[in-house]
């Protein structure tokens, strides 16, 4: 059967591996189970097999693919593909050059190419639409199916760079499939986050091996994968993701929910912050726990209204941090991420980027320098972990906040004299191929919170970190009717107002510590946002 390029469905792309078959199954039985339940494209990948056996295997799989009207792709072996008249070939960067492959295959066959750099996209764009039909974008995450991986995992941000390059070089014809380390626990996050910066394209599909080939019940495994692709919504927290402009009434409702639910806030944070953060959390009607014990994170995450504040001011063991992120993501409990000193040192940059790649965060909160660096709008490396926005204007800070919110599908907070809060969750919605249909970072809803200068805030330790405690308390206390954006905005508004109130009462930096906790307690328990001193307005 001949498939036209336009009608190929890349959404669920199965790559075979005969070395991981469960007992009682065959390669053909696993492939057919996948095809029965939603696989849309099959690639035979065999690295250690005699040509005669490869051809025989390919012919058997081809019969099954024809039965389900699904294209068959051969990995690397152009001779095998031509011998059985397969529907196409997939090659890597070190395989036969693309122009030569196309010359051998002819114009009608599907030709795929593994791509991991924007420069490779530039090359395929120069070749034009007659060469590469689709690219495998990756490797996204670590994977055991590559015995000697030559590329480091790129994560969703690397995939975004590839999608941006396709748009920049106008390779509109080229389809994309995410490859490498994709499993049910990260597929929806990848589909949600991997959107070009101009909002005009997203991944066309995902490629998997072990989740079908190694599954004892490949039918059920494929149904689950198909369901994730078709869901079009990633509900990564148990509250509402739809945003409207916060009002005093909606913020009152948030505080009432926090007060009623008394969330448990697990702090993984720096030692300087721990005591002050615990007292701030208590002042907000919440229960703090300072725990960096890997073996208990799953239990803590499952406590009703649990919330995690992950602050990288002190570098905890990376495996413990990953375990915590995974535990909270697994049960859809919110994580507030504070990438302290994001790019201050290579160690911090590597740690923060690793964690950003590993999980989904309900809120990413940082000072001006951190958010500018995250958005790649900072021209210099941070000096230490303190904020140093200098003369950066409010338009640039808003833009940076919106970029972070857009790229990480989160509510982003940029702190300073003016606090910016942007919602990039898109209600958790995602679409294959079409991205956000042209909606970009600068289109995201963003609010500005200000209360004049409060210089004494910078004269105490952990004032910025404790805003993280406040946000984590508010979003952890939401029930299913609460709105994430309202909670984050309400937390920032309360904290700013409490800071101003405390600054009028204190005698110096020592008493400011105490007055800030008292002010937070007072404003939270009074629950009268209409009387708070900080102002809230939409940006433009």
UniProtKB/Swiss-Prot annotation:
5-(2-hydroxyethyl)-4-methylthiazole binds at residues 290, 462. Binds 1 Mg(2+) ion per subunit. Pfam families: HK, TMP-TENI. 4-amino-2-methyl-5-(diphosphooxymethyl)pyrimidine binds at residues 43-47, 75, 114, 146. Gene3D superfamilies: 3.40.1190.20, Aldolase class I. Its cofactor is Mg(2+). Changing residue 370 to K: In THI6-3; possesses TMP-PPASE activity only. GO terms for molecular function: ATP binding; hydroxyethylthiazole kinase activity; magnesium ion binding; thiamine-phosphate diphosphorylase activity. It comes from the Eukaryota. Residues 239-540 are annotated as: Hydroxyethylthiazole kinase. Its EC number is 2.5.1.3, 2.7.1.50. It catalyses: 2-[(2R,5Z)-2-carboxy-4-methylthiazol-5(2H)-ylidene]ethyl phosphate + 4-amino-2-methyl-5-(diphosphooxymethyl)pyrimidine + 2 H(+) = thiamine phosphate + CO2 + diphosphate; 2-(2-carboxy-4-methylthiazol-5-yl)ethyl phosphate + 4-amino-2-methyl-5-(diphosphooxymethyl)pyrimidine + 2 H(+) = thiamine phosphate + CO2 + diphosphate; 4-methyl-5-(2-phosphooxyethyl)-thiazole + 4-amino-2-methyl-5-(diphosphooxymethyl)pyrimidine + H(+) = thiamine phosphate + diphosphate; 5-(2-hydroxyethyl)-4-methylthiazole + ATP = 4-methyl-5-(2-phosphooxyethyl)-thiazole + ADP + H(+). SUPFAM superfamilies: Ribokinase-like, Thiamin phosphate synthase. CDD domains: THZ_kinase (cd01170), TMP_TenI (cd00564). Pathway: Cofactor biosynthesis; thiamine diphosphate biosynthesis; 4-methyl-5-(2-phosphoethyl)-thiazole from 5-(2-hydroxyethyl)-4-methylthiazole: step 1/1; Cofactor biosynthesis; thiamine diphosphate biosynthesis; thiamine phosphate from 4-amino-2-methyl-5-diphosphomethylpyrimidine and 4-methyl-5-(2-phosphoethyl)-thiazole: step 1/1. Residues 1-238 are annotated as: Thiamine-phosphate synthase. ATP binds at residues 365, 415. The active site is at residue 465. It is an enzyme of class 2 (transferase). 2-[(2R,5Z)-2-carboxy-4-methylthiazol-5(2H)-ylidene]ethyl phosphate binds at residues 143-145, 181, 209-210. In the N-terminal section; belongs to the thiamine-phosphate synthase family. Homooctamer. Essential for thiamine biosynthesis. The kinase activity is involved in the salvage synthesis of TH-P from the thiazole. This is Thiamine biosynthetic bifunctional enzyme.
């Amino acid at each position: 059967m001949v498939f036209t390029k336009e009608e190929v469905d890349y959404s669920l792309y199965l790559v075979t591996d005969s070395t991981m078959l469960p007992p009682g199954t065959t390669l053909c039985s696993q492939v057919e189970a996948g095809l029965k339940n939603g696989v849309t494209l099959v690639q035979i990948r065999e690295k250690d097999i005699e040509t005669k056996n490869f051809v025989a295997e390919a012919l058997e799989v081809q019969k099954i693919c024809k039965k389900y009207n699904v294209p068959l792709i051969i990995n690397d072996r152009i001779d095998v593909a031509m011998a059985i008249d397969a529907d196409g070939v997939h090659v890597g960067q070190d395989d036969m050059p693309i122009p030569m492959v196309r010359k051998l295959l002819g114009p009608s066959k599907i030709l795929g190419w593994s791509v991991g750099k924007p420069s490779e996209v530039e090359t395929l764009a120069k070749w034009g639409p007659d060469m590469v039909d689709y690219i495998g974008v990756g490797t996204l995450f670590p994977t055991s199916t590559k015995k000697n991986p030559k590329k480091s995992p790129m994560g969703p941000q690397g995939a975004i760079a590839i999608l941006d390059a396709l748009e920049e070089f106008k390779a509109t014809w080229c389809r994309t499939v995410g490859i490498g380390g994709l499993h049910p626990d990260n597929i929806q996050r990848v589909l949600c986050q991997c959107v070009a910066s101009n909002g005009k394209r997203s991944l066309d599909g995902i490629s998997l091996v072990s989740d079908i080939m190694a599954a004892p019940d490949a039918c059920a495994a494929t149904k689950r994968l198909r369901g994730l692709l078709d869901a079009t919504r990633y509900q990564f927290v148990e509250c509402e993701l739809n945003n409207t402009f916060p009002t005093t009434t909606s913020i009152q409702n948030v505080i009432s929910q926090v007060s009623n639910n008394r969330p448990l806030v697990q702090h993984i944070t720096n030692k300087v912050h721990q005591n002050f953060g615990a007292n701030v959390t208590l002042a907000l009607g919440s229960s703090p726990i300072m725990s960096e014990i890997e073996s208990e994170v799953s239990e803590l995450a499952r406590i009703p209204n649990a919330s995690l504040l992950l602050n990288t001011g002190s570098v905890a063991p990376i495996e413990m941090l990953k375990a915590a992120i995974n535990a909270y993501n697994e049960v859809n409990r919110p994580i507030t991420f504070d990438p302290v000193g994001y790019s201050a040192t290579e160690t911090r940059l590597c740690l923060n980027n690793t964690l950003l790649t590993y999980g989904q965060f309900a809120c990413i909160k940082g000072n001006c320098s951190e958010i500018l660096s995250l958005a790649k709008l900072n021209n210099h490396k941070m000096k230490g972990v303190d904020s140093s926005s200098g003369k950066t204007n409010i338009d640039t800070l808003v833009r940076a906040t919106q970029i972070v919110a857009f790229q990480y599908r989160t509510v982003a907070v940029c702190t300073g004299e003016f606090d910016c809060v942007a919602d990039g969750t898109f209600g958790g919605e995602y679409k294959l191929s079409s991205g956000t249909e042209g909606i970009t970072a600068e289109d995201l809803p963003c609010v500005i919170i200000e209360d004049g200068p409060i210089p004494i805030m910078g004269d105490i330790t952990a004032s910025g970190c404790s805003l993280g405690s406040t946000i984590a308390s508010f979003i952890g206390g939401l029930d299913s009717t609460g709105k994430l954006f309202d909670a984050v905005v309400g937390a920032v508004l309360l904290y700013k107002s409490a800071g101003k109130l405390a600054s009028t009462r204190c005698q110096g930096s020592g008493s400011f510590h105490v007055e800030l906790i008292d002010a937070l307690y007072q404003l939270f328990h009074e629950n009268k946002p209409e009387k708070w001193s900080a102002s809230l307005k939409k940006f433009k």
